[in-house]
Amino acid sequence: MKIVIADDHAVVRTGFSMILNYQNDMEVVATAADGVEAYQKVMEYKPDVLLMDLSMPPGESGLIATSKIADSFPETKILILTMFDDEEYLFHVLRNGAKGYILKNAPDEQLLLAIRTVYKGETYVDMKLTTSLVNEFVSNSNQDTANTTDPFKILSKRELEILPLIAKGYGNKEIAEKLFVSVKTVEAHKTHIMTKLGLKSKPELVEYALKKKLLEF
């Protein structure tokens, strides 16, 4: 099977490439250092599996890239490779197209099993994460979440400028410099955005921005 590895650390890309290329049924055809490059490599090489890190540079995080790649290249199975053992990240990446989720500190044998599992079209979740979490994901995915009122419409012009920048991973200082406002102003707008939209976390904000098509290439 053909594999692409997306991680912003060169040593990680090299290390995992060595492990995978040693297998008779695996070949790392390309690597990427951020989400944009990952999208380009998948488009070019059409891999069977993409190993995607979540915490990549601001602008195109693994959360954002996962959704876009899953939509554009459904034949490529995405396996999230990360240090985050937070159930909220697992929930959002699975709902946005990933087929599996494994921690970077997992044994090599577990990584290989995860890759072969998603390659077959099955879902793989790291053994450290509970079964109840997967059940919660399935339950929430089947719920009708339609609302009659869209809170997006009550965001101010400045909040609409800041929302996609937050979702792309830019910090308060970086956003302030881009928009020529103070850090305190950005922090205030950020609080207002989360409150108005009823969001409680960064993954929720990223998912919301994706649904509203605010993070297009």
UniProtKB/Swiss-Prot annotation:
GO molecular function: DNA binding
Occurrences of domain HTH luxR-type (ranges): 148-213
Domain of life: Bacteria
Positions bearing 4-aspartylphosphate: D53
Keywords annotated in UniProt: Activator, Cytoplasm, DNA-binding, Phosphoprotein, Transcription, Transcription regulation, Two-component regulatory system
Keyword GTP-binding applies: no
GO biological process, one term: regulation of DNA-templated transcription
InterPro entries: CheY-like_superfamily, Sig_transdc_resp-reg_C-effctor, Sig_transdc_resp-reg_receiver, Tscrpt_reg_LuxR_C, WalR-like
Residue ranges annotated for the Response regulatory domain, each copy included: 2-119
Modification comment: Phosphorylated by NreB.
DNA-binding region: 172-191
Stored PANTHER family: TRANSCRIPTIONAL REGULATORY PROTEIN YDFI, TWO-COMPONENT RESPONSE REGULATOR
Biological function: Member of the two-component regulatory system NreB/NreC involved in the control of dissimilatory nitrate/nitrite reduction in response to oxygen. Phosphorylated NreC binds to a GC-rich palindromic sequence at the promoters of the nitrate (narGHJI) and nitrite (nir) reductase operons, as well as the putative nitrate transporter gene narT, and activates their expression.
Name of the protein described by the UniProt record: Oxygen regulatory protein NreC
Gene name as annotated: nreC
